[in-house]
Amino acid sequence: MKLTFLGANHEVTGSCTLLEAAGQRYLIDCGMEQGKDVYENQPFPVAPGEIDGVLVTHAHIDHTGQLPLLVRNAFRGRIYATKPTAQLCSIMLRDSAHIQEFEAEWKNRKAKRAGAEPVEPMYTVQDAEAAMQLFRGMEYNTKIELAPGLVIRFIDVGHLLGSSSIEIWVTESGATTKLVFSGDIGNQHQPIIKDPTTIRDADYVFMESTYGDRSHGPRPDYVGELSRILQRTFDRGGNVVIPSFAVGRTQELLYFIREIKKEGLVTGHGNFPVYIDSPLAIEATRIFKDTDPDCFDEDTRALLAQGIDPIQFPGLQVSVTSDESRMINADRVPKVIIS
């Protein structure tokens, strides 16, 4: 058995580890380095065509963003992820590919003026769509034999819808070794998704530790603080603009705002409008709505059992096109804009 750390070992992004065991080569995650020019990402140190498969912990781009590049370079194995992760990757990888194409087009306009050589995008939308054809949606808590001597299991880790730690059992020369790749570990008591599952035993654990030495203190009163901000801003005729990650954070905000409206915590403004001004966030919200309720926490499942959509409420509107986004500016009613 051999492990090679290809990313995120001296930095936060670009998670990617090569496991060579039981005659197989598997990547655990295949993330994009972020925070610098993506064209400076290094080529794979192992030929993509020689990789048997990829195990994905969750859909964030720093864990999945190079999957289309892997496929572009002749990878034809399977990509294993939970079903919600596969669904989220279908929109996030396509969105990332659009960005790669746009960035390449912008660089080439500059290159043409300077007489420089054109550049190719890291990957294209076509590459992202090809990568999605290789995904296999897995259930939580179910052991899967990838090959003789190589067994895996996805365990809910409460970071993002579909996120997981991956347990791997490697059997070689009659001895079995258990590895755990933590993925990103979520906090307790987050809305919508379940709390992280505790894994009881392992021979080796490889874990994310970005916040490993931080004491976060008591959980903030998000609903109370947000309702006070909304009340104060609406009372003076203003709008509340919330920049938000499209996947995960936007849905948490919708959950909190539904509770604020239900409890009447903002007074004098009726069913104030809330706009989702992000096509990616709109698609992600649809995936949340279509996900198996078993992926959600007890409170969310209880709402669904009563026929209550936990991230839907009166006054929620979406803007998909640029014209619809511009129309928000013409609406003088105090509102929330999530973008």
Language-model-detected regions and their locations in the chain:
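His/Asp/Glu-rich metal-coordinating catalytic cores
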Residues: 1-55, 64, 71-252, 258-267
